[in-house]
């Protein structure tokens, strides 16, 4: 049994069940359980039994256990709160907004964040897994490797950052995923995204109701998918941006009720810019007391670019999607991903469970006769 596919299928089976239980659609839930049972049995009875057991546990856990929202419980902690107070005392106005956005994921009353939301590129301007992975990889590569000091330092920085951003799900994803990779290097596949999602749901059982959680994991699924495709290196950013737009557009529509026709181009344009300002914000932080509000000058090009982008873009007004649309849309995407994964990434699995199945072999013999 392929663990990567198994965790993905468990997650794919659980998510509709979670929302059906929330809506108290128990008849639809029963039909869904029958469907995933039949599909699992077609694959393997052990797979079916294990999948149903885990999915049933997660649905019961989310239904009976009171809602735990870890990102709200620990948002004001002993690291984040003093840091915010220091920024508020040292800066004001737009400089205060921009520093909070790039350093600690604070989006309240932030003009740049609102512009990014309208442009459908909001995932680039919050502290994402990409930023933290970049930070950990930087420390792992360049710090002293003896006694695993580089990895220990990397985890220490990730943990501090986790408190700084108030346990945002995108940061929690990187921390758990990186920890799993380092501790269970041989036992788990390298991209343990589905397992990480299930563990976060165990920590915060209503994580699926959080848009940050959904944006982070959906975008990451797309990036992992594209990285394994045999494409020209120059084409990968374009393909990634296009697929991310396709995958997260229902969430963007739900928040904004319109789509940016130039989203793909703006994703390509703003991706390196967002990473640049993430790094620059930390570099200028020690000098804020010296230069004061003049430090905002470094953010002026970004502000002007975001405002210009709003003026030149074309918006498509589309009705806000409902729950049924989400089920159908992401159900089809999940099914296509599963089929493509089996057929493209693992030919042995495809051959073992389909091409070499008794039914197919018997049809081949009849055809040859």
UniProtKB/Swiss-Prot annotation:
TM region positions: 25-45, 47-67, 119-139, 152-172, 206-226, 235-255, 272-292, 296-316, 323-343
InterPro entries for this protein: ComEC_N, Competence_DNA_uptake
Topology versus the membrane: Multi-pass membrane protein
One Pfam family of this chain: Competence
Gene Ontology cellular-component annotations: plasma membrane
Keyword Cell membrane: yes
Name used for this protein in its record: Uncharacterized protein MG316
Lipoprotein as UniProt keyword: no
Species: Mycoplasma genitalium (strain ATCC 33530 / DSM 19775 / NCTC 10195 / G37)
Keyword terms: Cell membrane, Membrane, Transmembrane, Transmembrane helix
